């Protein structure tokens, strides 16, 4: 990454070249702590306990195959990203980052600008999905 006048920007995170959704990506995620894990660790996730997360990280939890809502979110994410780009005029791409100081700190980012100064988290809730299907319009 380059900063002012082409000088390198010191970042706390290294680029991890993985395609999100692959087996390799899932293994990488499971071998560290990411943003999605934080609410679980804090006891703020009503669907997963810290003990469940620990079993996941140890590889001993019952494998979760996902559900219809997750499948919809995954399917809509590329279109939501395009819509964000059209509105904001900022190009973003999925990205994986890992702390260069604490390699267990990880981020699987829905959208990151090449400059590194814009991060997008995409959520496609069911009510938004229904409105989108009915109106045939991507929400703004």
Predicted regions and their residues:
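Charged, glycine-rich intrinsically disordered N-terminal tails and low-complexity linkers that flank
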Residues: 1-75
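Mg2+/Mn2+-dependent nuclease catalytic core
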Residues: 62-63, 68-140
């Amino acid at each position: 990454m380059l900063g002012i006048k082409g000088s390198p920007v010191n970042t706390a995170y290294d680029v991890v070249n993985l395609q999100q959704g692959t087996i390799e990506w899932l293994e990488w995620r499971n071998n560290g702590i990411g943003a999605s894990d934080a609410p679980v660790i804090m006891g703020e996730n009503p669907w997963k306990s810290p003990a469940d997360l620990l079993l996941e990280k140890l590889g001993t939890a019952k494998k979760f195959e996902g559900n219809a809502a997750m499948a919809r979110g995954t399917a809509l994410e590329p279109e939501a990203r395009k819509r964000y780009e059209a509105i904001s005029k900022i190009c973003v791409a999925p990205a994986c980052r890992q702390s260069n100081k604490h390699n267990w700190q990880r981020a699987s980012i829905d959208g990151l600008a090449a400059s590194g100064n814009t991060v997008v988290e995409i959520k496609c809730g069911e009510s938004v999905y229904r409105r989108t299907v009915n109106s045939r319009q991507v929400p703004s």
